[in-house]
From Swiss-Prot:
The lineage of its organism: Eukaryota, Metazoa, Chordata, Craniata, Vertebrata. It comes from Xenopus laevis (African clawed frog). Interacts with CDK2 protein kinase to form a serine/threonine kinase holoenzyme complex. The cyclin subunit imparts substrate specificity to the complex. Pfam families: Cyclin_C (PF02984), Cyclin_N (PF00134). This is G1/S-specific cyclin-E1. GO terms for molecular function: cyclin-dependent protein serine/threonine kinase regulator activity. GO terms for cellular component: cyclin E1-CDK2 complex; cytoplasm; microtubule organizing center; nucleus. Residues 1-23, 56-85, 385-408 are annotated as: Disordered. CDD domains: CYCLIN_CCNE1_rpt1 (cd20579), CYCLIN_CCNE1_rpt2 (cd20581).
Length: 408
């Protein structure tokens, strides 16, 4: 991959094209005031003022001081729900129950059960294959990790949102599963084109085509990107609206911090907590084995490592026993994150303070993967020498517990 040298990014004008009827719009509302500022005259002072206000009051609210977010939320009222008729047979090996009760609160703009069923259907329709590299003998799984790490860096340079990156990751993985014998020299073209498509879907002001070509240091021309764009969209069947990992995580964290009578329209969770958990997702997505799990399961399992089982079950609709396999798989990644230290919220020129956590950052995940491999080897060795697997604790057997009680 070429080394990125922080080029001067031009401000892109708003794309005037309308989205296809088969692809729902993912555009955000523009903060017009920010984009009307003269960056050479007023933007610097505006950012300094906002940053000072942020430091004085904290992100969104003073609830940041609470270490256990579940303590802030009253238990929602349970309602009777219709069984979900969706067929989950292709996830049978993961032992997920076919019926998942909606954890969403009452919504003023839609039926919460319909929204939840649609979210679950996304994971059923948009399938991934962790073994797709078997179709490409010239490629190795670590090449995917290098590519995704580079795409994170591109996103940070152009101030693209996390959702844009995770869309690109999904497009890349699903497209590669439809292909055979892709050569190494085409991998970067597929990756940057996936990001190009994702940016046009998600960003208000996506970078220009020539900027995507420029960031590859001339390795991918504009014509090659436009031709590959059509190939990718056709082979994906124009299915370009998955429920990404970070989309699931946003919903779960919002449910964790939602208060009564709120309309579930704007984020209500602390940014600092958000970036700690999303760093774990950024790291684990570099491993091809993440494709073994549905995106919702990955997001819920990541939350498990930063909260309590009761909260995870409440906000995700999954039982911890259903998440156990993914939780254990994430243990080496969580250990590496802990060893690397706490993440800090980054601020970007031209990006509103309240949106800073949504900008995809490049935090050296590729280097952390070396620690992950070391942790995986250590845990495997412990599992061989210990009868009790590490990662997830299990209660003692009832007969042993009775003997222990009698001895006392």
């Amino acid at each position: 991959m070429p080394v990125i040298s922080n080029p001067a990014v031009e401000k892109s004008t708003k794309d005037e094209g309308t989205a296809s009827c088969s692809v729902r719009s993912r555009k955000r509302k523009a903060d017009v005031a920010i984009f009307l500022q003269d960056p050479d005259e007023t933007l610097d002072s505006l950012e300094m003022t906002k940053k000072k206000q942020y430091q004085d009051r904290g992100p969104w609210s003073n609830e940041m001081t609470c270490k256990s977010p579940h303590k802030l939320i009253p238990t929602p009222e349970k309602e009777e729900h219709e069984p979900n008729p969706t067929n989950y047979s292709h996830f049978a090996s993961l032992r997920f129950s076919p019926v998942s009760v909606s954890p969403l609160p009452r919504l003023g703009w839609a039926n919460q059960d319909d929204v939840w069923r649609n979210m679950l259907n996304k994971d059923r329709i948009y399938l991934r294959d962790k073994n797709f590299f078997q179709k490409h003998p010239q490629l190795q799984p670590n090449m995917r990790a290098i590519l995704l790490d580079w795409l994170m860096e591109v996103c940070e340079v152009y101030k693209l949102h996390r959702e844009t990156f995770y869309l690109a990751q999904d497009f890349f993985d699903r497209f590669m599963a439809t292909q055979k014998n892709v050569i190494k020299s085409r991998l970067q073209l597929i990756g940057i084109t996936s990001l190009f498509i994702a940016a046009k879907l998600e960003e208000i002001y996506p970078p220009k085509l020539h900027q995507f070509s420029f960031i590859t240091d001339g390795a991918c021309t504009e014509d090659e990107i436009t031709r590959m764009e059509l190939i990718i969209m056709k082979d994906l069947g124009w299915c370009l609206s998955p429920m990404t990992i970070v989309s699931w995580f946003n919903v779960f964290l919002q449910v964790a911090y939602i208060r009564e009578l709120q309309q579930f329209l704007r984020p209500q969770f602390p940014q600092e907590i958000y970036i700690q958990i999303v760093q774990l997702l950024d790291l684990c997505v570099l491993d091809i084995c993440c494709l073994e799990y549905p995106y919702g399961v990955l997001a819920a399992s990541a939350m498990y490592h930063f909260s309590c089982p009761e909260l995870v079950e409440k906000v995700s609709g999954f039982k911890v026993t259903e998440l156990q396999g993914c939780i254990k798989w994430l243990v080496p990644f969580a250990m590496a994150i802990k060893e690397g230290g706490k993440s800090k919220l980054n601020f970007f020129k031209g990006v509103d303070i309240e949106d800073a956590h949504n900008i995809q950052t490049h935090s050296g995940c590729l280097e952390l993967m070396e620690k992950v491999y070391i942790n995986q080897a250590l845990l495997e060795e412990q599992n061989r020498t210990s009868p009790i697997p590490t990662g997830v604790l299990t209660p003692p057997q009832s007969n042993k517990k009775q003997k222990s009680d009698r001895a006392d």
